[in-house]
Amino acid sequence: MQSEAQSPRSSQICSTEPVFGGHQPRRVSHAVDVRWGGQLVTIGGDAPVRVQSMTNTDTADAIGTAIQIKELANAGSELVRITVNTPEAAAAVPAIREQLDRMGVTVPLVGDFHYNGHLLLRDYPGCAEALSKYRINPGNVGQGAKRDTQFALMIEAAAKYDKAVRIGVNWGSLDQDLLARMMDENGARAQPWGAQSVMYEALIQSAIGSAERAVELGLGRDRIVLSCKVSGVQDLIAVYRELGRRCGFALHLGLTEAGMGSKGIVASTAALGVLLQEGIGDTIRISLTPEPGAPRTGEVIVGQEILQTMGLRSFAPMVIACPGCGRTTSTLFQELAMQIQTYLREQMPVWRKEYPGVEKMNVAVMGCIVNGPGESKHANIGISLPGSGENPAAPVFIDGEKVKTLRGERIAEEFQQIVSDYVARNYGRTEALN
């Protein structure tokens, strides 16, 4: 018979306070400044993990592209990437920047170049100047002897105009000359690596080798960001762990072609969550395929929510809501939770400027008496709506104290006003701080 000292129950009792660790410290990296006018976004170093996005408009449509960039910036995107693939697109970039400046949108723009970037940056100096950062893909910057020359031309443009670059490797467009050479070298090994390991190594060598070549050409390490994008969760984790171990460059995280809807969100969250928890990653982009007619801003919100739920940054007040069960026969709490979440998101462009700190606020919308009062007390503001068979009243808690009870048909409107009043009362306007 098992003694008390050996029982599972007693072994779970700690005599000393256990160490409950959170995410690991951020990996040390070079800080890369990306600027436009007075707007400075630093990637890496001790800067917060940045959220960026990409337009899906025809860049040659300057007005349409500027409108979408403004939407992404208003949603909280700190950098916005645009495709620069044709002379028409390159010619439109200065007009896009001018439109944004007139609208008061100072978000830095990143030019996404493939195949012909060396020509576009040379032939359209206005484009080269209007962009704040260039994305270069080593896999398609040129083939054979042309590759080094064309890569050098892009790096020289970045140095000339003092622009940051992202050297972005993608396994769908990996440098085939490099991969073939590495496959041959692997075949000559006494104990050849698996094909997957060779692929990982090729991605990493392409990124780091290209970055070191850029440094040789005169670009500072504090002007370079690296990425090695793949579409598999475990592949991304494996590649970035090794990439992060082997270099000090700032790293851009993203699962390429993550997919649509919940699948894309889950895949991106699973991959980035592991890496961010380990302190790897300085900027993220969530590559979601939007549903027809859906706003492009969804990828920004998902990126923000990943960082916020992990406790790495705060972007908007968090709404805590129960999932519902047999005790919550009414849909009122679901509708209220959705309404409050939408309201908070809509207010953030103004609140972010006027009420610093509001992004850390928590609001609880609960559906019955089981967890409702408790969760509501833990939040800054909480409401516990009545469940099935309960008294048709909704107690409201502010900073842990019950302050009033709402009844009737206007619970949603009254609670929204309570939230608004709380924000105005507890988060000082910026002009009052100056």
Curated annotation (Swiss-Prot):
The UniProt note on the cofactor reads as follows: Binds 1 [4Fe-4S] cluster.
Which positions bind [4Fe-4S] cluster?
A: C322, C325, C368, E375
Task: Indicate the enzyme's highest-level EC class.
Answer: oxidoreductase
Give GO terms for biological process.
isopentenyl diphosphate biosynthetic process, methylerythritol 4-phosphate pathway; terpenoid biosynthetic process
Composition bias, Polar residues: 1-15
Cofactor(s) demanded = [4Fe-4S] cluster
Q: Which Pfam families match?
A: GcpE
Which EC number(s) are documented for this chain?
1.17.7.3
Q: Which Gene3D superfamilies match?
A: Dihydropteroate synthase-like, Sulfite Reductase Hemoprotein, domain 1
Determine the domain of life of the protein's source: Bacteria
Pathway(s) where this gene product acts: Isoprenoid biosynthesis; isopentenyl diphosphate biosynthesis via DXP pathway; isopentenyl diphosphate from 1-deoxy-D-xylulose 5-phosphate: step 5/6
Keywords assigned by UniProt, alphabetized: 4Fe-4S, Iron, Iron-sulfur, Isoprene biosynthesis, Metal-binding, Oxidoreductase
Q: Where is this region: Disordered?
A: 1-24
Q: Which GO terms describe its molecular function?
A: 4 iron, 4 sulfur cluster binding; 4-hydroxy-3-methylbut-2-en-1-yl diphosphate synthase activity (ferredoxin); 4-hydroxy-3-methylbut-2-enyl-diphosphate synthase activity (flavodoxin); iron ion binding
Reactions catalysed according to its record: (2E)-4-hydroxy-3-methylbut-2-enyl diphosphate + oxidized [flavodoxin] + H2O + 2 H(+) = 2-C-methyl-D-erythritol 2,4-cyclic diphosphate + reduced [flavodoxin]
Q: Give the record's family classification.
A: Belongs to the IspG family.
What is this protein for, i.e. what is its function?
Answer: Converts 2C-methyl-D-erythritol 2,4-cyclodiphosphate (ME-2,4cPP) into 1-hydroxy-2-methyl-2-(E)-butenyl 4-diphosphate.
Q: What is this protein called?
A: 4-hydroxy-3-methylbut-2-en-1-yl diphosphate synthase (flavodoxin)
Q: What is the lineage of its organism?
A: Bacteria, Pseudomonadati, Pseudomonadota, Betaproteobacteria, Burkholderiales
Gene designation per UniProt: ispG
